[in-house]
Amino acid sequence: MIETGLSGKVVVVTGGAAGIGRATAARFAKEGCRVSVWDRNEPAAVDDLDFQRVDVSNTESVTAAVQAVVARWGTVNVLVNNAGILRDGQLVKVKDGAVVSTMTDETFDAVTDVNLRGVFVCTRAVAPVMITGGGGVILSASSVVGVYGNFGQTNYVAAKAGVIGMTKTWARELGKYGIRVNAVTPGFIATDMVQAMPEKVLQGMRDHTPLGRMGSPEDIANAYVWLASDAASFIHGAIIPVDGGIVVGT
């Protein structure tokens, strides 16, 4: 069994009320971490986790949450930038040779505000705490589509590709302070939201994955825990695929 060295660490998980975020918060708690869940929505059961109602795209909201966590536990050792939303649509939709719709500014901004700006705002707020504390780990959720693009997801792909760029930049900037920065690129993950899709769509996801199945939220949570652990102490600036081989097969 890998010794993670995470017991007693203070971990912030954004978007931690459900899905991958919820599984991630639970997995860090299992390692003996003190976990603060940041989300717009309160989880159904917080157990012994701290909960902060946070809009990750809003500087004041994030600053207040950081102050609350530091007031309670003294520091932040690990930040998991997991919060994300979808608002899919084509850049330009054409029917019978005529343009019938385009992606609106509001649709583009809604996704990039959370999925890209939110990662920036949270990392900017937490990094000084980690520098003062002598180091830490910053992990962010990108996506396989941030690597190869995807039809109907201009906003989402732009944000997830941006997360990859920010991760590599911050690895260069923050490494000297003992802060490791990495990202994961999940593939098709069987969250409750995804599993509610039609079976034909789900089968298409499985068929597109070389392992022949979708991943679970716990698969991503395990990757986050490993990347935050002592076992990954020399992994820095990496973009780790957790996708069942999708990128390899694309």
Predicted regions: what they are:
Residues 90-109, 194, 205:
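Substrate-binding pocket helix/loop in short-chain dehydrogenase/reductase
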Residues 1-2, 148, 224, 236-250:
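Short C-terminal tail/terminal secondary-structure segment
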Residues 175, 180, 235-237:
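Short, small/polar-rich loop/turn modules that mediate ligand/substrate recognition or access, typified
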Residues 54-65, 105, 218-219:
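The beta1-alpha1 cofactor-binding region of Rossmann-like NAD(H)/NADP(H)-dependent oxidoreductases
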Residues 123, 159, 167:
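Active-site helix of classical SDR
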Residues 85, 99-120, 135, 139, ...:
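Catalytic Tyr-X3-Lys loop
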Residues 114-132, 171-172, 176, 229:
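Amphipathic alpha-helical dimer-interface segment in Rossmann-like NAD(P)H-dependent oxidoreductases
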Residues 183, 206-231, 235, 244:
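C-terminal helical subdomain
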